[in-house]
């Protein structure tokens, strides 16, 4: 399954993990809300594991960060997340999101393979 808009691409892996690629350079609150709404629509509002490539993102506003880190906002229905950032600016942004609530498991990776390996292992163990 695959869905796409010009700025965000969602696909489901063979292992049932959602892979998202963000093509926005700047993420403000409205864009963050749209990304989350698109993700929830893609997953039919079911709980899921997520690998999110934010390598192209260069800026996230404070309001967007707060929304994306909130359990009823950006974290809604995510059981665990692996963030991919392949450049220094995106890596700084990814590290902000890794510092989410303690009961939410998230990690930062510099490549897709490591991110998928980690999230698939968590899913197979039933860990969030």
Task: State each model region's role.
Residues 1-128:
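Amphipathic, Lys/Arg-enriched alpha-helical "gate/interface" segment within cytosolic domains
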């Amino acid at each position: 399954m695959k869905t796409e808009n010009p700025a965000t691409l969602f696909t489901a892996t063979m292992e049932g993990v959602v892979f998202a690629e963000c093509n926005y350079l700047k993420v403000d609150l409205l864009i963050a809300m749209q990304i989350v709404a698109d993700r929830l629509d893609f997953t039919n509002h079911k709980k899921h594991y997520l690998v999110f490539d934010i390598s192209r993102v260069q800026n996230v506003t404070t309001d967007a960060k707060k929304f994306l880190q909130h359990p009823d906002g950006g974290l809604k229905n995510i059981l665990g997340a692996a963030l991919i950032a392949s450049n220094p600016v995106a890596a700084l942004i990814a590290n902000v999101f890794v510092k989410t609530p303690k009961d939410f498991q998230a990690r930062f990776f510099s490549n897709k393979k490591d991110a998928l390996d980690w999230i698939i292992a968590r899913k197979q163990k039933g860990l969030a």
